[in-house]
């Protein structure tokens, strides 16, 4: 697995980049509130200080400086912004950023799905059919 500082970019031979999802580990160690706090800290590292949101320019600049991802193309940065930009304003606010981080974590999404399913089953008396 690649470290967070050196993700492997997709190639024809390897269409999927190597990626290790650290969010479940962070959630386990920090708890829910601690994880959200850390995501908010990450947001602040990437945001444009004057606008209070992550813009194309701030992500481009800070991804290189803070995360060591200087090899991102403009298209990579545009896609990253577009992926989480729910209100279509061309930037990520703090809520959009945190939601995006959860959506991009397969393990956290699966755990959330299981939790919601369990609550629904308990609330409405449903049982799983195999």
UniProtKB/Swiss-Prot annotation:
Ca(2+) binds at residues 85, 87, 89, 96. Keywords: Calcium, Metal-binding. PROSITE patterns: EF_HAND_1, EF_HAND_2. InterPro entries: EF-hand-dom_pair (IPR011992), EF_Hand_1_Ca_BS (IPR018247), EF_hand_dom (IPR002048), KIC/PBP1/KRP1 (IPR044205). The keyword Metal-binding applies. GO terms for biological process: cellular response to hypoxia; response to auxin. Pfam families: EF-hand_8. Residues 72-107 form the EF-hand domain. It comes from the Eukaryota. Induction: By CHR12. Disulfide bonds: none annotated. One of its GO terms (molecular function) is calcium ion binding. The keyword Signal does not apply. Potential calcium sensor that binds calcium in vitro. This is Calcium-binding protein KRP1. It comes from Arabidopsis thaliana.
